[in-house]
Every structure is written in structure tokens, then in C-alpha cells.
């Protein structure tokens, strides 16, 4: 068995062979420009490389590969390009100024470098220069190095020199990045030097030095800014530092402001303002834009405008970075570009540019995307993206690797033998990219469907194609060669194998074959069946092979015919198969051989335009018929070309009768027959002879400028243009032109001459050739026109002042030539004096001469000789220096010492001749210059000198002379200077010490002797120390300023009672003199600083305590110990304090005797000296020992039944210990039996049962302590009764309780039957049943409870018990303790930092004072501080206060109940006042030309330290103040840099804590020569109209002043009006702020059964009130200080329902809308002030000028007359209409004289009361018995100042004063009282306060009140509304007043009335409340408005809506 297998592979393209690790890369991708000097040449390495080694080539930008030019250009084998040095005549633009690139190629591909511009720089001469500059002293100067533009790009400034000395950038000299020289803070000496710049050529290395320039320095003069350095545009790359220069000259120093794109530029971070301008660090493209530098001062502005271009370096990035694909796939590349916009992007593959085509697409913005479809193997390699913009370029590359995608057979079927009917499955597994298509054949015939074969395929996960061929039942005919063919775009692969099916062998019929001559042909024998023996081939019965071209493969039956030949190989071929040895079969096939055409090659010869063309195409062989066609450039030839084609058999000819350029192209002849189609191609090039497009013409060239000689030609090939030159105008002899940097041929063929010279004049020939036809040429003549040029002139020349000077210059050029002379920027005219210009022609030259007669200093400078003709101009600069004697130097004092003066001078104008020396003169100020000391010929190199051996503190005058070779200068300005002081040589005199306190010593002394002071004594140093015999202690030094010849100082904060030694030294500016002799003194004695320590107390008996302590150290005693004081007091059980006692002793122990038994004592110990008591020790507590108790204070016994009695008792008055129990004894006499019963210590009654009826028993009680039984009580007798009468076991007595607590009054009654109990309260001597309500109730055991006890609950309560057999009664006196009364606070002493307050305590409220709270606040501040104070103290000193400041103080006492009323607010001021300048001191110590020394010693601090000091000055007539850099006040201050000979205004402001003071002054600086300037005088200039400018200005100023004055007056009136109102309300604000503080502190919990909170209490203090109180029968004027009491109450519905039973009544229907709390204080004790603001409701806002009215109700008692208490001060009789006055009680220290107006805050002159005054008056009223139950009506209104006099007089008629005047201050227009309600007539009188008494007759009333009372006695029913203003009227249209409407009383008032006799009871009739009169139609509104919860209820405003007949009233008691 044998196997036949054949594998063929076919490829459609040639590919590169890949190395396994090949790559390409760049070694210097940034190389883009190479510039070199022509004299040095350069080497340029190729920036590309690769692995394996690459082939490097260089190309021009046009793509032409460069070649070696011997001696000029060479490419080394390593790829380095070398340009050799060359002379200028060999310069070639093609080589020396061109763009190159190089390529690197290896098997990976080919990459191309970026374009590299190679440029040679020719050496050419150049000069740099610097121009003179001008500036002002103290300003900035800028020198610039001017470089010719032709070399500016290559030449840089490397340094600057100042008189041959190199300058280094430092503090004053700065060299910028652009090469400019900045000189900062220019001084006069800077003008003495020459300045030049040094440059270096970047490529040739040549250096150049500029000419010398001078700096002219002038004195500062007011001027607008002028730009010294700026910029037009700047270009930079991102990341670089950019400097934008902007510097200007101006005075004052201008301000710089930068803008970018017209927006202010924030100078921070990367943007920094420097001396030179703007510095931008790390520039960014966003920084590009327009920049404006605005420079301005008060005299003008200037601008620098320029643009900045910041370019981002171009960067190209290709993605993806790695591309590996397969043949036939698609590859996409993207090129991202960063950098500038609008760049040009192009793609390259293997160094060749890519253009869009069939399979290449370039898309995206700016062609950024490259897409290639159907990649073939040749598409692999290096891809590059190039980006170009201007001269910048960037590239990136990526290698694209294409894998072989040709199909490959992975696995396939093999040859096999099968039996018939056996199934067969053939598999072919193929891979390839793209996926291949698999087809099947059998013996070269395609297998079709339905032939018994099934074909299927699948794609595996690996991407392989698996094709199946299945035969379900094989047959013999299915045998043969099976072939699977895989085909894709990359290629095709075949696999075949034979499948033999057993059966008889045979041959399938074979098709005839056509073979192509010259190629190979295969013939297959298609055998089927198996097995067989052999296969043989025959041709014409001849067994094959019979030659070398025939090969027979017996194993597979294939015959191969190589290089088929028609004559030999064509014919019949037979295949014979031997089936069996004797059996064979055969089959024949005919082979036909076809011969393809063969075209004889042809080529187009060289044709020129217009010629005729004939080209034949001959097919020399090939089978006929043959078809011949022609194509041009791959397309059929169009008929429009005029081409004729003739075809004859096997030939074809192409004919063109008239050749033109359009016939250029590739022509192809194509021959076709049945065998094949062949073609031959040849290129036709039409050559065009040259001809001129632009012919040269004669033209003119101007010397020194560029000229272009035009010449342009065309032709094909492109013609070459060559220029030749013949010098001169003679017969032309043309010679080639040597091209160089000056002469170049442009790309269009024109000749460029950059700088025309005279030698360029002549004939120029333009020759054009291209080897086609004859060359053409044309000549032209260039005429060189010479512009005017200065050929000869002196650069510098000298002249002597006053002499004649001539200067000449020679000009050359085309005539006519005009020569003119200029001085600086001024043209010299013939009519100008002293100048004479003459001109003459000498040959081709013109000579001009300038004569100056005579020369003066102003002639120094630059003269220019300016020559002008029609072709140009030139200028020669001549520096004329006029020499003269120098100007005097400007001298100043460099240093002044006590013995030397160092001068420094600045040389002014040197006379343009070097200074040869200086002369210095010095004299005493008072001497003449004739006696001056002289120093001559000081070296000119010096600019300072020192004068020695002068006297300290003496005044000298100094001047100088300068000399040069011309002469001597005038004397300089005279400087007067005082030598520095030396330290004093003598001590202060008459030093005395005087101790002034325990911690201070007063030191007095006098200045040292005059001749020893060595200057002005500025101050003193006081040295002090604690004196000791050793004397080793170091002195403490205090420095003080001097105030005169006699000095005084007080040393503070010394140790008390200590011996001190003290010395004094005088000081001046030079130092400190010797000290005085040490003097010894001792500080005064003081109280001890510390309390005794280790205080111990031990109770030794029930009545004694032993106390011991440690004595004090000497340091703590502060004096001589006089003894110790022991203070002690008993702490009683009820919390009260016993009497405070003290005992003195000299020993450190003491025994206290006679103490209360078993009592807790507080003990303190202090030491005292002769100065007083020291600090008390901390309290210690010790209790005396127990003893037997005293007898019970009382015993009661009563029968409860026939066999039982009750015993009750009171505790002993002297408990003497803890009661352990009580023993009750009961005995009867017959027989005597004593029974003992024990009761617990907390029970006070005992029931004794089982007694005998009708038998008397004796009962007594004994208390028992741990010490034993005490004394027995009295023995009482009791008898048990069956009918036991009612008896009360409770004892009568006094019950004391704090207010706002629940109190239970016991009443335990016994009897049989059980008695009934009732409680009564005594009211004005008449008992009445107690009221049972929510607050009062009676328990079932008979006890009476009062919840939240109030002051009015005080009084006598009686409990009555009765039954059928008797009754009993007890009386309990209930005393309610209340907060204490206000203390009376005064100021006793003030200092600069402390205020000592003293006070007298008020009533303690029934409970001893526990302490005080002192509040204080700084004036105009609402922040209050507080201090707790001991109850025994009566004064307090506040330390560390501000000096010279007003303070407010209040004091509050506290007892066991709580804090009481605050005292009135008093004010005091610490010592001190605002600073002031002493009139005896001179402000200006010294004045010269530019400096002023101020003497600040004259400032007196006013006793308070200086806190701030401000000093400002400005030149007279200017508006801008200059603030001196000064923050503290010292002895002197110097103002620098002033303008000479100028008047100045000066103002100072000095402040301390007491205030500020200002001082203004004018001064004038001296002239340059030291003289004074005239005083200020207004100049007068007469105008044409006769009116002076000054007069016009006066009129304008006068009108302006009048207008401003009127405006200021109006504003002042508004301010005064506002301040008056603020001052009137200031006191109320003080009370408000204090109330706010107290409201936050005084919250406490009420001890009620329900644990309700107590209300907050607010005290409103009023210093004074004047009140008119009306009654029906009496009227009193009360004047005193009082406080109104306010507490809160709930005015909800519940309160309204209880209005008949409680003491507050609301007479306003909409009271719930009130804006503040409605307050019920009926339970308050007079003089206290609880309040809260809960349940406050908002209401309508009050309107101005509306009256508000409050009615205050309180029941009036009917009691007998009493006298007034001592707290009341009745006014003395006075005249009618007068007003009581009382001196203000505020304490004012002696330092307060200047603020005397502050001591009274409330006017006592006005009858109009403030709300505070009303509150005080009301309190006094309610404390008066006969007014306690009166109803008060308060009417509020707004009054004016004009109406106060009428109100004070108390007019009885209505006036218009209230309605017509301007509203001013809120006040009280009316205050009336109404009778009490009848049911309130019997209210409680037993208050726990002193009773108020009233006078019994009219004697004590003021006369006007008595008169008013008598006048109204007869009208009991008339409303008492005739007093004090009577009403507040709302201003309306009409002024007619109606009789006031009288409001009806409230329903409660009208429901009852009382009457009695005048002797026993006060008679009251029902009256009405006086209210506001109204006009018709007027709406008078009134509603309560509470401004805040802390303000008084009386400080309210409101309005009543509608015609409500009721006034709003509040019940306040």
C-alpha cells in the first residue's frame, strides 16, 4: 500500500523578514536647530538609531538624499553629518542654511527624524552702544545695551562696568535677563562714573565693549511718570521664567498696577512684582495675553502695553503604543497633540508620507486618526505622526507588527483504504486570519451537494475552521484524490490525500488540458478502485519520460511537463493502469499548448515641446489573434490629447503630431491573446527650453539698504539661474558672483543684496539654462545712490566756559545735501544767539562748522550734525564738554559724636573737569568765617572726613569748597550741627526721700550742676534696693524723663515697712552720669498682709472655747505687731447671726468665756499693727459643750374627757444641747402618786389616759439632754371632766418665716364634744375671718396654712375653738421676713487706678445681712462685673481700673431671704485726664534742609499712660498726609527726606484711656544754603478784568464755606437733638443693662408644696422723683428716692375670673394684647422688687404723640393718723409755683471737676417726670399709710422743652403748649389718686415693716398744695384734674379744647363705698380717675407696650383703639 500526499503553499506578496528582537528609537528627539559659526563648522549626529544596527541616511527637506561635497559637506559612516568651515564667499544657501532630516532603517522598518534646520552664521563686524540717561536722586536709572538688529539674535550682554570695574547684581545694581542695568536708589555720586556694557557673540565667541555713558542725576522734582524700560512683546516656552520690564521715572515715586486682558492682575504665587517689573514663574500658555503696566503718581500716569506669547512645546503621542495585528486585519492609530493650536499633522509609514487611498483613511480633527483596512504584509513597519507649526515640530512613532495570516493546515485526514459501503469521514482543521473558506474537490472536480457527500464546518474556541466531508456508504466511484483548499485574503493552502475504495480499478475520463508555453504543467491520472499494480504515461506510444523536462510519478500517477514547448509537448497523452498482471486499463487526454504574446521593448527618446512623436509596439511572438491597446498613466488615452493609434496585425503605433506638456506621462502597450496578456511601459518626458517670466531691468539701489534684482524663468526641467557681475559702467566683463550672507539668490531666481555698498554699482547678468534648447540671458545696470552720510566728526570735544568753540563735520552722498545742527532735541536756528553755522563744499564732500560764542555750562551735552539728502540721512553725535569751576559739594552729616563730627558730601557738578581737591571750613556758630579752622586739599578720592577735638553739645557751622584745574567752587551750603552729648560728669543735687505710704517713697532732687551736665538732661535713673549692712544687693533701676530743674518721683509697689537705699543718676543722650550718694529711708507701717495660721479652737465647757494660732513672720506683719484680735459670733439655729464680738490679746492664744451653751460659733483671728487690722483668717466653727436644758417655756393641760387629759408644752428657751426626750409628770395629792411619762423630743403634747373623774391632777414637764434633766416647768392643775369645755393646746406667740414659703399656723383644740375651730385676722384692730381660697385653707386638725406667704400676710392671727361647754382663743403674730432694703452707696476715695466705695446698710428685712454684691460697669458700657463682700464690711476698694474713666456702681444687700433692692447707681471717675502739650516746651528742636527733629518731651500724659501716638505731615497746599512710622511716644522724633525750602503742616494726636489730644503746627525746611524761607504769603496775579486770581479764589472759597457751614449746622442740629434724647434715656439704659444682669442671676426655687419657681426680681433704681398726688381732701408733694416693685402675674382668663377676690384689677378689655408682662405685686413688701416676664403677650405698636395712661390701684386702710417715718423727708414750705430741689447724692471725687455736668442725670427743675422718677414716687406713695390703698392714675405724654415751665407751674387751665410744641422727651403729665374700693378698706395693717405716719393737718403741706386743697374742698364730686398739666393732648387740626371727659370708675370701684368720721377714719367719696381730654373726631389710642422684660412696667407706651371710655389701669402695690 502506498500513500500520496501533496502540500502546496502560495503567497500573494513579498514581505519583510522579521528579526525576533528588532527595534528603532531616537537618541536625541529634541534636535531641531543647529546654528554654528562659519569659521568653525559643525558635526550633526543622526538622532535616530536601532537594533539590529541601522542604515542611516541624510536628506534635504525636499526628500532629496544628500551627497558629499568635498571640503564642504560629508556624511560619515556612522551617520554623522559634517559641515566644514568655509569663507563667506563659499556660502551656499542649499548647504549652509537649509533644512535636513535623517532616516534609520533596519528589518523593523524605517523611521525619519524631525526636521533639523542647519544654519551657518557669517562673521560680520558690529558695534554696541549705550546712551546717557537722566534720573532723579533716590529714583531708579536704567541703562540699555543697544545691539544691531542683524546680530541681536546671536549677541548677549555678559556684564556691565562702572569705570572699568565690573558690576555684580546686588542691593543697588541689578542686571536683568534682557541685559539692562538697573541702578536703584540713585545718589549724586552715581553720576560721577562712566557705564559701559560688555557683549559676547554666542557662536563666534567675540566680545565687544560699548561706548561710555554717563548718568545725570538731578534733585527730586514733582513730575509725571516717564517710562524708562518696557516691552512690546515677549515670547516664551511654557515652564520658563518670564520677566516683563516696566520701570518709570517720576516724583513722588509712582505706583505700579498690572492688568492682564484689561483685568487687574493678582500679584501672588507665580506672579511677583519686582524692581524691574513683573516676574512670572513657571509660565503657562494661559499666561498669554495683553499686559498693561499702569504707572501713576499724583502728577500723571504712563502705561506700558505689550503682549506675552507663551507657547506650549509641541508634543505628539500615538496610541496605542504597541500594535500587533495580522495580515488582512484593520489597524487604527490616533495621534494626540499638545501645544499650540492650528498645527499641521501628517502621517508617515517607513519614512514615506501616507496619503488617503483605497485601504488608507485619515480622519478626525486635523487628521489625527489613521485607519488602514485589509492590512498586507508590506504594511508592517514604523508609523510616525509629525506635527509642525512654524519652526517647531514634534513626532512620535509606533511599530506595527503583522503576523502571517496565510491559512495553515493544523490537522487533516490521511490516506486510507476503505471497503465498499463503509462510512468515511474526512476532516480538515485550518487556521488563518481572516478566517479562511474551505472547499473540497475529488480528482480536481468540485464536490457538489447531492452527490452522496455531506460537507459541514465549525469554528473552534481557538478560532480555527474545522471542515468535515462525510460519506455515509462509500462506493468504488468515491475513491480518488480528495483535496481541501483553505483560502483567505492572505493566501491559499491546499491539502490532498488519496482515499482508496476496494473494487475493480478503472480510470475516470480526463478533460483536455491547455498549457501555456514556457510554464510548467501537471497531468493527473484519475484512477479509481483498489488495488492496482502500476500507472504509466505514454505519448505517441512512447513511454514517458523520454527527456529532461518530463517527470512521471508512478506512486500517484502524476506527469509533470516543465517549460512547455508547443512543438514538442503538444499532443495526445495516455495513462495506463496495470490492474492485474495480464489486465490493464488506459485513458487518454489531449494537451494543447498556447504561446503568449511577447512585446519588443521600446523607449521614448528625448523630445522637446512642438516636436512630432512616433512610437511602435511590435508583438514579435505569440499565438494569433492578438489584440493591442494603449494606456496613459494607467488609464485609456483620452481623445482630447490628439494621440493617434494605428494597429496592423501584430503591430501598433502611437503618433503625436504636436508635442506639448500635457503629453507628459507613462505610456503602456498591452497585448492579449488566448494564452495571456502582456504589457510594456515607457515614460514620455516633454522638455521645455527656458524663457523669462520676469526680465531684469535697470534699477537704483540705496547705499546700506537691501535691493532685489528681479529675474524669474520657467522651463522643463526647471531651469537654473546664474548671476554674473561686471563692476562699473564700462564695457561689461561679467564674472560669477560669489554668494555670501550679504548676497543671496532667492528661490524664484532673483538676486538679493542685503546691504548695498558703492562697489555693487555695475552690470548684472541673469543667465537661464536647462539643457533644452539655447540658454537665455539678460543684463541690467544697478545704480547705487549714496544717502547722506557723515564721514568725519569728533566724538568728543572740550571747551572752557566763556571761550569760543568750533565744531565741524563732513558729509558725503548724493547732492544736494542739507546739513543742520541740533542741540539735544533742539534745532539750532541762525537767529539763535551765540550760535553760528557755516557750510562749504569741498569736492564730493560738504563741511559744516558750528561756532559757539561764548560757551556756557548749558552748552555741555550732545550736539548732532544732521546730513539729509533725497536718499537718506545720517547723524553724527558730538559730545561737547564745557569745563568750568565745579559746583560746591552738597554736604551732610554722616555721624556726630561727642568729640567728633563726620561729614559726608556728594559732589555735584564737577565742572566737567576732574576734582583736584576739597577745602573744609569749621567754626563755632557764633563766630565769623574769618576765624574758622580750615583743612585744605582733601583728596578728591574721599567723600567723607572727620572733624576732631570738638566740644560736646556745642553747635558748629561747617562748609566746603571743591577745586578742579579750572578753579575753585563757591562755598557749599552751610550746615549747623550740634555735637552729641557726653555723659554727665556730676550727680543730681539735693536728693531727698520721703515715705508716703507703706509701699511708696517720694524722691525729690535737682539737676546736676550746669557745667557738669554735658548736654540736655533727658531723664534720670533711680536705683533702689532693700538696704542691708552687707550692701551686696543689686539696685533696681527705674528710668524717668525729666520735667525741669527740680524733679520728683514716687516709687510704688515697694515692700511694706522695709528699709531702702536709693541713688539717682542723671541721663542725657550720651549716657548716664555718676550716681548720688546712697540715702536710706523706711517705708511706712501697714496692716499685716496675711492672717495668722494654724488657727485652732476647742470647746472646753458649755460656756467657753480655747483658741490658739501661730504668730506671723516679719515679712507678713508689715510693721510692729500690736496684738491679735479674735472676732467671733454665734450661728443661731434659725440661720441668723448673733452679735459679732471681738477680743484683743498680745498672746497667740485666748480663752473665750461667757458663751452660749451648745452653740456653734464662727471664729476669725487677725493681727494688727499701728496701721490697723490685718487680714482675717478663714472662719473656723466650734460648738460649745452640752449642758442640762432649761425648763420648757410653757405648759398647758386640758381635759379631753372624763378620764383623759392632754398636756402640751413649748421647748425650753435654752436648749443647751440636743433634746433627747421630754418627761411628763402627773400627780394627785391624795394619796401622793407621781407618774412619769416619756415623750419623744419632737413631740410637744402628750395624752394621759385612765384618770379619775372630777379629780385634780398636777402636771409638769422636764426636758432631758445627754447632760441630764433640766429644770421642770411650772406646775399646772387639770381636772378630767365629762363635759370638757373647748381648750386650745397650742400656745400664742410669734411665728417668723421667709416670704414665698408655705407656713402652717397650728391650733390644736380638745374638748368634749370636739370643738369647732375658726381663724381670724386682726385688721386695723378689728378681727375678721380669714379668707379661704386657693392660697389659704384650714386643715381638719384646726391648723391654718398659708401657701407662698407674702409680706401682707404678716399680722396677728387668732384661733378660736368652742363647743357647748366653753371656748378658747390664741393669738399668733406672723412675721414674714423679706429681702433687705437698699444700702446708701457713696464714693470715699479715688486714684488713677482705683475707687474706694463706702455705704450705710438699709433695713435688714427682718433677717440679718449675710453679705453684699457690688456691681460696676464702665461708662457707656452695658457689661457689668460683680464682687461679693463680707457683711461686716462698710467699704470696698476696686483696683486695676482704667485711668481717667467714669464708672457706675450699685450695691445689693443679701439676708437669709435673698438679695434685696439694689442701691441707686452712682458714678465716679478715676484720677487722670487726657494728654496735653506743655506751653513751656518748644516742639521743634532743630530744622535743616531735609530733616526736622521734634521735641516730644512737652507731652504730658495727664496722669494716664499714653496708649497711642499718631504723627502726620504734608507740604503746605497738598492734600495727602504722610503718616510717620511711629507707634509710641518718646523723647524726640526725626522726620527725614523732606523737601528743602518747603512749608509743612504737622498734626499730632496723642491718646490715653482718659481721652485724646491733638496739636497742629507749621514749619519750614531751610534753603539749600541753610537760610530760612519767607513766610507763607498768598500771591496776587492781576487778570485782564481787573480781578486778581486770589480775589476770585476768595469768592469761590467764601461761597463754598457758606454752603458747607449751612450743611454742617443742619447736621449739628440733628446730632445735638439726638444726643439730648440719648442723654435723657441714658439713665434708663443703665438700669436696663443692670437689670439684665440681675435677671440672669436672681432665680431661686420657691419652697412651696407644688415646688413652683419663684418669680424673677427686677430692681429699677431712680435717683429722684417729684410727684403731685391728688386726693379729695388732701394733696401732698413727696420728694425722695424710691424703687418700684414689680412682680409677674398671669392675666389669662383665670385671672379675670378672680378679679373680685384678688388685689389686682384690670380695667382694659383687651389687656391680653399687652406687649409686656402685666404685673401683680399686691403681695410684695414695700421696698422689694420681684418680677418676671412670663406670659407676656405682644400687642400693637404705640404711635408717637399719643398719651398713655396707667391706673395703679391699692386698697386704702382706715386708720388713725400717724407721723411720717424717718425715711421720708417732707419739703419745707415754699412759694407758690416753686419746685422742691434736692442736691444730688452722687459722689464726685476731686478729679471730676471737669465732668461736673455728669454728676446729675435727671433734672430736678422740670415738673415732667421720667418713668424712673414715677416709679420712685409711686413707691413712696404706697409706703404712706393714707395712700396705700389709693388708686393712682399715671398719664404719659410727649412734652417739649417749651412746655416744661407751664407744667412746673401747675396751671389750672388747658393750654396749647402740649399740642403745638415739638415732641421731645417722654414724661409724666399727670399723676392722680382715687379713693380705695370699699371692700379694701379693712385690709391688713400689721405688716412686718415700720408703719408710715402722716401729718394730721395742713401745716405740713406746701403753700400751693394747701391753697389747691382749700379751693377744691367745696366740690367733692368734681374730678381732681386741675393739677400739673391735667392732660396730654394729641395735636390735631383744631386747637379748640373741650372740657375733659371724666372716665367712669371701674365696676369694682363703683360697687361699694365707705364713710366714717375724720377723727377715726378717713372719709372717702367715690371719685373718678382723671384722664385725657380729647378733641372731637380725634382718636386717642392707648395700649401697654413693654419694651423688654427687664424694663419697668412704667416704661411703657401704647394707644387705645376707638373711643374706649376706660383708661388702661394696672394694679401695682
Swiss-Prot record:
This protein is called Cell adhesion molecule DSCAM
Q: Output the CDD domains linked to this UniProt entry.
A: FN3, Ig, Ig_DSCAM
- UniProt domain Ig-like C2-type: residue ranges: 20-119, 125-216, 225-305, 313-401, 407-500, 504-592, 596-685, 690-783, 787-883, 1285-1377
Subunit structure, per the record? Homodimer; mediates homophilic interactions to promote cell adhesion. Interacts with DCC; the interaction is abolished in response to NTN1. Interacts (via extracellular domain) with NTN1. Interacts (via extracellular domain) with UNC5C (via Ig-like C2-type domain). Interacts with PTK2. Interacts with FYN.
Q: Glycosylation annotated at which residues?
A: 78, 470, 666, 1160, 1250
> Topologically, how does it sit relative to the membrane?
Single-pass type I membrane protein
Q: Which residues lie on this side of the membrane: Cytoplasmic?
A: 1616-2013
Q: Which Pfam families did the record assign?
A: fn3, FN3_DSCAM-DSCAML_C, I-set, Ig_3
Question: Fibronectin type-III domain spans which residues?
Answer: 885-982, 987-1086, 1091-1187, 1191-1285, 1379-1473, 1474-1575
- Which organism does this sequence originate in? Mus musculus
What transmembrane ranges does the database entry give?
A: 1595-1615
A Gene Ontology biological process term: post-embryonic retina morphogenesis in camera-type eye
Q: Which residues are the signal sequence here?
A: 1-17
What does it do?
Cell adhesion molecule that plays a role in neuronal self-avoidance. Promotes repulsion between specific neuronal processes of either the same cell or the same subtype of cells. Mediates within retinal amacrine and ganglion cell subtypes both isoneuronal self-avoidance for creating an orderly dendritic arborization and heteroneuronal self-avoidance to maintain the mosaic spacing between amacrine and ganglion cell bodies. Receptor for netrin required for axon guidance independently of and in collaboration with the receptor DCC.
Tissue-level expression reads:
Expressed in cortical and cerebellar neurons, in cells of the external and internal granular layer and of the Purkinje cell layer (at protein level). In the retina, expressed in dopaminergic and Nos1-positive amacrine cells and most retinal ganglion cells (at protein level). Expressed in the brain with highest levels in the cortex, olfactory bulb, hippocampus, thalamus, cerebellum and spinal cord. Expressed in the retinal ganglion layer (RGL).
User: Keyword Nucleotide-binding on this protein?
Assistant: no
Q: Provide the protein's localization.
A: Cell membrane; Cell projection, Axon; Synapse; Cell projection, Dendrite
Q: Which UniProt keywords apply?
A: Cell adhesion, Cell membrane, Cell projection, Disulfide bond, Glycoprotein, Immunoglobulin domain, Membrane, Neurogenesis, Phosphoprotein, Repeat, Signal, Synapse, Transmembrane, Transmembrane helix
Keyword Disulfide bond among UniProt keywords: yes
Region feature (Disordered) = 1718-1809, 1920-2013
- Listed as disulfide-bonded, the cysteine pairs are 46-102, 145-197, 246-293, 335-385, 428-484, 525-575, 617-669, 711-766, 809-865, 1307-1359
Q: Which GO terms describe its cellular component?
A: axon; dendrite; growth cone; neuronal cell body; plasma membrane; synapse
Print the organism lineage.
Eukaryota, Metazoa, Chordata, Craniata, Vertebrata
